[in-house]
A protein has these predicted regions:
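Gly/Thr-rich phosphate-binding beta-strand-loop-beta motif of the actin/hexokinase/Hsp70
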Residues: 2-24, 112
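Intrinsically disordered, low-complexity and often Lys/Arg-enriched segments
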Residues: 1-6, 29-32, 55
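Short, basic/hydrophobic alpha-helical segments
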Residues: 40-61
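Short active-site oxyanion
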Residues: 7-9, 59-62
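Short glycine-rich, Thr/Ser-proximal phosphate-binding strand/loop in the N-terminal lobe
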Residues: 14-42
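TOPRIM-like Mg2+-dependent DNA-processing core and adjacent phosphate-binding/basic surface
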Residues: 71-89
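Long, charge-rich intrinsically disordered scaffolds of nucleic-acid metabolism proteins
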Residues: 87, 91-144
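Acidic, metal-coordinating catalytic cores used for nucleic-acid/nucleotide bond scission
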Residues: 61-73
Length: 144
């Protein structure tokens, strides 16, 4: 059994109106877009990805997203639903210097998924830096 079996990976590109979800199992990729902040729709898409990849409903999910204006409530929501999440420092993400860099939510989500897979499946250590998620009270004090 390989390391990636029985795991689903999800990268999220969060924007004001929509969230781009990019799922993978180490072999295939599936992208979906949902309205921002819709927890039930997010969980429905996670279930559909597991089904599409032929995995059990209780298959663990590992996810990531870039730290940004949404703060850390998304991380807490994912954790509350049994999803293991890391919040990535956007400044730590490698950017191709030579090639012209196209920026779309679809491409960004796919790149984030690739980084998550490199770290989780192939053990690459310096793929990205993880942000320490503050508690709710600490986050509220930071916003003042």
């Amino acid at each position: 059994m390989s390391q990636q079996e029985n795991k689903v990976f999800m990268a999220m590109e969060l924007s004001k109106n929509n969230w781009k979800l990019c799922f993978g199992d180490g072999k295939r990729e599936r992208q979906r877009t949902i309205p921002a902040g819709q927890e039930k729709l997010l969980l429905d898409e996670v279930a559909k990805a597991k089904e599409k990849f032929g995995l059990d409903p209780d298959t663990p999910v590992f996810s990531c997203y870039e730290a940004g204006r949404d703060g850390f409530w998304v991380d807490r929501m994912l954790s509350r639903n049994g999803i293991v999440n890391v919040v990535i420092d956007p400044a730590s993400i490698e950017v191709p210097r030579r090639a012209r860099h196209r920026k779309t939510d679809r491409l960004d989500a796919s790149r984030l998924l690739n980084l998550l897979l490199r770290a989780a499946l192939w053990g690459e250590r310096k793929v990205f830096a993880v942000v320490v998620v503050p508690g709710e009270g600490q986050e509220a004090r930071m916003r003042i």
